[in-house]
Regions:
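Glycine-rich phosphate-binding/catalytic subdomain of phosphoryl-transfer
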Residues: 1-169
Length: 169
């Protein structure tokens, strides 16, 4: 129902249930572990990102949650970038911005996300991360993600039904 877990009583005191913005560097260890696996496996997407996974990107933060608060990881239906979540709230349509997916989640428009095998090598609990907790239509920058819902139109003082584009970093 799009409710962030931090809004639920059982997760109110759990830091990993809250938003982890780009500047969050708590997942340095997870980024290093993921990078070591990517290098050892010769992941072809890694050089596209400068040969090093950053703790500021999506998967190290998700992995940090899995390692330190597995109950949060298990309870989360979705993990997403803040911009994609805002667009979801505005339109009621879950989409992913190609900009965010490409930059923060190693998505390639022809090859997709990194393989299940990569994620399984990182941690068996991550094997199905894409299919289970990320999968949604990916839309290009400036592409229509949906239309503004009536409730959001009232809240924002805009017209219901106007087109809403994907987010951009």
């Amino acid at each position: 129902d799009k409710t962030p877990l931090c809004h639920l009583p059982e997760f109110k005191e759990e830091p990993h249930a809250y938003v982890k913005l780009w500047k969050h560097h708590g997942a340095e260890e997870e980024a290093k572990l993921m990078n070591d696996v990517a290098v050892a496996r010769g992941e072809e997407w890694l050089p596209t990102y400068g040969g090093k996974i950053s703790s500021e990107w999506m998967y190290p933060k998700i992995y940090e949650t899995l390692r330190h608060a597995p109950e949060v990881y298990d309870a989360a239906d979705r993990f997403m970038e803040a911009g994609d979540w805002i667009i979801w709230q505005m339109t009621g349509e879950e989409t992913r911005s190609a900009c965010c997916a490409g930059y923060k989640a190693y998505y390639h428009h022809e090859k997709g996300y990194p393989s299940k095998d990569f994620f399984k090598a990182v941690d068996p609990g991550m094997e199905n991360i894409v299919a289970d907790k990320l999968d949604a239509p990916i839309k290009g920058v400036g592409e229509k993600a949906g239309h503004l819902t009536a409730s959001m139109a009232r809240e924002m003082g805009l017209m219901e039904g106007i087109p809403v584009a994907t987010c951009i970093i």
